């Protein structure tokens, strides 16, 4: 067992910037269009991570690239890819390499996968021993970008998944990978609605705060005729990421909208004069 980082009280935010003119704050989803949402991400100095519950990656990956091109994210994270392992091996996404995956063997659908841009060097972190179908499906990669090292984790919990098992396993995963010099990013569909305060959200927030991680997506990610929820999220250490923004990116490929995290730099264990902006 490793020691967790000291707990700190951090506000839940949409963006953190060094000054008010560096980067726009997260736009409200009711006031943005797909074109508007892309604007903060066009600066080549940003490192971009994409997550979507894709509800089957089969026959969607080429259309997905057409939505993103030419401003391709550095990392693509998918939950519910719905593919078997051999099928996933046959999915080729131009400009990307398969970095890590989990595929179900006992149940249909589900699964998580991470692709990294061909310009990056990534290492797979083997989390297979932590996976339990429906309760927690998880995979991770480690990336070295200039002088920074990141661990990107993608997680899925089914609506019928056991929450306590999910919570205990996330804790175990974070204990296994945590390092003060490592920038940890968790993205995924955890089926906890972050538009409301509920007991499951409180328990997850309290656990993640032990690792200085907070959810930064405060906009709806799934809209139906009867509900509006934010069951997909991105969790980061807001004290270490410099000039970050997280935005929705509707593309019509799923009933879940994309979240795109973009940031300029990571400062391990410090906050470089940052200012929180809601």
Give a label for each model feature.
Residues 35, 150-155, 183-199, 262, ...:
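Arg/Lys-enriched, amphipathic patches
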Residues 76-79, 185-189, 214-220, 235:
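Active-site neighborhood of phospho(di)ester-bond hydrolases with catalytic His/Asp-centered motifs
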Residues 53, 80, 188-189, 256:
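Active-site glycine-centered loops adjacent to acidic/histidine catalytic or metal-binding residues
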């Amino acid at each position: 067992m490793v020691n967790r980082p000291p707990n700190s009280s951090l506000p839940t935010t949409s963006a953190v910037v060094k000054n008010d003119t560096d980067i726009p704050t997260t736009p409200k989803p009711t006031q943005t269009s797909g074109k508007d949402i892309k604007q903060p991400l066009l600066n080549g100095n940003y490192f971009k991570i994409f997550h979507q519950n894709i509800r089957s990656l089969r026959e969607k990956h080429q259309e997905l690239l057409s939505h993103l091109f030419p401003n391709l994210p550095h990392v693509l994270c998918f939950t519910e890819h719905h593919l078997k392992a051999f099928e996933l091996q046959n999915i080729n996404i131009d400009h990307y390499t398969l970095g890590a995956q989990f595929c179900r063997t006992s149940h249909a659908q589900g699964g998580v996968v991470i692709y990294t841009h061909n310009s990056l060097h990534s290492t797979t972190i083997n989390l297979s021993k932590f996976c339990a179908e429906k309760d927690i499906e998880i995979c991770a990669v480690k990336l070295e970008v200039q002088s920074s090292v990141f661990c990107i984790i993608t997680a899925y919990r089914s609506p019928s998944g056991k929450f306590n098992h999910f919570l205990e396993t996330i804790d175990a995963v974070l204990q296994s990978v945590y390092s003060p010099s490592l920038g940890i990013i968790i993205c995924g569909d955890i089926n906890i609605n972050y538009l409301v305060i509920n007991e499951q959200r409180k328990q997850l927030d309290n656990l993640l705060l032990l690792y200085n991680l907070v959810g930064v997506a405060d906009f709806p990610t799934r809209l139906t005729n009867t509900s509006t929820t934010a069951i997909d999220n991105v969790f980061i250490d807001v004290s270490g990421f410099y000039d970050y923004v997280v935005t929705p990116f509707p593309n019509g490929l799923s009933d879940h909208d994309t979240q795109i995290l973009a940031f300029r730099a990571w400062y391990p264990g410090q906050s470089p004069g940052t200012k929180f902006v809601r």
